[in-house]
């Protein structure tokens, strides 16, 4: 979040108050941000190289408990809660990928300038850890799956705000309500979904295998979400493309709600 804020300041320094920049001027401004980011990352690498503890000897012994066991894998594959949780994470991660376009929406639909639009993305980066801490505290006092239900409802309401087309230039209050609902719901899901492994009655000894199976499937939006979102935006330029993207997000919100409800029902039936 701090790094993004500094990047915005550098970008603003290069473009100043100009609103009609040439491609060359925009390239120079972006180059300044890239140089800063590259230097920062290189500096971190140098610090890690010199100050990371090198005295610890690597453990070359093989612990039998760490060896992949096919029977454990099959146990995980036969757990309904694992598949419900996979769907929950999949839908939540689709929501997370959509947060990448909020800044673009601010620029192309709300007609913000480049600096203000980038600032939206920076605000979201500050919001993410704040939501994570608050949701973590709440999760200690109630069932995580209940909070996930609420988070999917928030994600759905936020996506409907954008998909309905009621958010137009000048309606900043509606824009921020839509962003807040969507982002809080999405970031809450990111903080919660693996916290319900215990609630799903997945044994601690199988946690690693379960997380591996869930992650292998549920994080596949990294592969196809970008092309899908890009296609929807390109096929209908302007607000129509964004309405299509947020309509898709609404669908995944409902699927996540159904998966969470099924997860809770499955767990409660086992308890009975």
Language-model segments: which ranges?
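A late C-terminal transmembrane helix in Major Facilitator Superfamily
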Residues: 201-237
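C-terminal transmembrane helical hairpin of 12-TM major facilitator-type secondary transporters
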Residues: 143-196
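Glycine-rich segments within core transmembrane alpha-helices of 12-TM secondary carriers
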Residues: 1-12, 215-225
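Extracytoplasmic gate region of multi-pass secondary transporters
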Residues: 8, 80-125, 129-132, 190, ...
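Juxtamembrane intracellular "pre-TM" segments in multi-pass secondary transporters
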Residues: 55-85
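Helix-to-loop junctions at the C-terminal end of transmembrane segments
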Residues: 131-143, 233-234
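A membrane-interface helix-boundary motif in multi-pass transporters
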Residues: 16-38, 231-253
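C-terminal membrane-cytosol helix-exit motif in multi-pass small-molecule transporters
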Residues: 7-12, 16, 38-59, 259-263
């Amino acid at each position: 979040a701090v790094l993004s804020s500094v990047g915005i300041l550098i970008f603003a320094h290069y473009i100043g108050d100009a609103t009609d920049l040439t491609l060359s001027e925009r390239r120079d401004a972006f180059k300044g941000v890239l140089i800063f980011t590259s230097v920062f990352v290189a500096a971190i690498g140098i610090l890690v190289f010199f100050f990371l503890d090198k005295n610890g000897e690597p453990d070359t012994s093989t612990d039998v408990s760490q060896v992949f066991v096919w029977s454990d894998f099959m146990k995980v594959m036969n757990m309904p809660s694992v598949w419900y949780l996979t769907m929950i994470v999949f839908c939540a991660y689709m929501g997370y990928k959509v947060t990448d376009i909020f800044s673009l929406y601010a620029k192309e639909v709300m007609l913000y300038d480049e600096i203000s639009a980038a600032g939206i993305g920076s605000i979201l980066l500050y919001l993410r850890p704040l939501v994570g801490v608050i949701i973590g505290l709440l999760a200690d006092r109630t069932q995580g799956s209940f909070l996930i239900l609420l988070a999917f409802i928030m994600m759905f309401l936020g996506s409907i705000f954008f998909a309905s087309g009621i958010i137009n230039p000048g309606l900043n209050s509606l824009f921020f309500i839509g962003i807040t609902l969507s982002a809080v719901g999405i970031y809450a899901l990111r903080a919660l979904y693996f916290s319900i492994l215990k609630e799903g009655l997945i044994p601690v000894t199988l946690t690693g295998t379960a997380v591996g199976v869930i992650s292998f499937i549920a994080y596949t939006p990294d592969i196809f979400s970008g092309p899908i979102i890009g296609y929807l935006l390109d096929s209908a330029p302007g607000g129509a493309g964004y309405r299509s993207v947020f309509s898709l997000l609404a669908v995944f919100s409902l699927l996540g709600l159904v998966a969470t409800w099924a997860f809770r029902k499955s767990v409660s039936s086992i308890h009975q």
